[in-house]
Structures are given as structure tokens and as C-alpha cells.
Amino acid sequence: MTAPAEATIVELWRYPVKSMQGERVTRVALDASGFTGDRRFGVVTPEGFVLSGKSEPRILGASAAVRADGEVEIELPHGVRTASNDPAVDSLLSAWLDRPLRLHRAATDEQFMIHHQTDPEDETKTKDFSTPPGAYYDSRSTVHLLSQSSLRAASRAYGDGQWDVRRFRPNVVISFRNGAFDDDEGFVEEAWVGKTVALGDVPALVRKRTERCVMTTRAQPGLDRDLQIYRSLVKSNHANLGIYLVPQAGGTIAVGDIVKVLAQ
């Protein structure tokens, strides 16, 4: 598999609250800890577990967006709005999901546990893992990149599926399309694993492919629950879709910026 040396950023996403719907942005600052405002808040249980759509699918029904002051606006499925600095936010979240909960901003010196359903076909198969300090990521990699060509390739393998980018929660969506390359092969960004790429002017190490899980099958606004999404990815690409990166410096990137492989 080969990938062209360049692509174009066509979408940027961040997810201010772990497993809630994210927001599409045109420009964002980032560093080794990821996008500014990405997964910096989580909904936490009294036992110290942060809720994830892997084990609590209902949380995907809420949405979150970062305000100019750094606080987060939250809209719950029944239309109630709250915010990270609202004294009532914990009680509203608890009432919505019918359990004691609190909204928590991640600190650089603390970690939380995530309860993970490991098998989309069997909800009894689970494991727990810890988040990295300072954010509620599932991985030590802090930026997720996905190409439009990979989405198209996945959809060809299962044409009846809703292959909406929101199922896969990328930070960066790229297009390889140009006059010299037809990107319909799919999954070509995986050829960048182990290399350093530049997102605009920001260098980032491509650490690994993104292995998918039950999250891809969950229902969310406008998308149905669909186990065949995951089953199809297992057959077509060993359950992988996209790549994980870690920025090696700080900077700002924008839609329209070029992504290119740096000299190794």
C-alpha cells in the first residue's frame, strides 16, 4: 500500500466532553496534548469512572461546544441547556441518566478509568483502562486522522450502512484527491504509520492504525444502531479505520492546510 506524500485538511473536529457529540471547527490550536478543548471534560461517576459511549450509549445523545471563555456549553437530548460553570450541571446530568454524576475538567496530574465493552456482539465482555493525564482520551495518542477515501472504501464493503464521519470521531479529515492521484483505493493513510507528517506547520508522529470498537455501532442523533458497521470493518480492514498521531510541537491548523510526509 502506498499513499501520496500530500493531502488536504477538509474537516476539523473536537469533542469537548468525552463521548458527547462534538463540534466542527475551521481552525484550532494543538500541541502534544491534542486539540485545545478536545476531551478536556468528562462525566464522572462516584467510583471515579468517566462515562464513555462504549458502556453508556445514551451519552452520545448530548452535544457540547467550547465557548470563547474556555467553558463548555452542553445540550441534553430533551433540549435542556447547561454549561461547565453552571452550578446545576451535575444535577441535570444525574437526572438525565438517572445516576449520581458530575462533570469534571481533567487535570494534568490525575487519571480516570473507563469501562469498555470489548465485544460488540457480547455486552458481558468488558475491560477497564485508564485515561492519560490531562484529557479523557482512550489512547496515549492525542489526534485521530481519517481520510475520506477510507470512508468510501469502508462504505463499498457495506453499502447499506450509514458511514457518517460522526461514527468515527476523528479530529482531522483529509482528502487525497488531486490531479495526480485517485484516492478510491482506501485505507492509504495507514502507509504513514511510523513516519512524521506535518499538519500545516505542526509536525506529528503517526503512531499506529486506529482499531475500532463498539462505539462505531452506537445509535446517535441521525444515525441508527448498526452492528454490521463493525463487522464489515473487521472483514475489510482488520477492524481498523484511520490513524493516530501525536503532535511534536505546538501550533495552529486550519481547514485547507496541507498534510505532508516529512523527510525521514
Residue ranges and their predicted role:
Residues 1-264:
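Metal-cofactor-dependent catalytic cores
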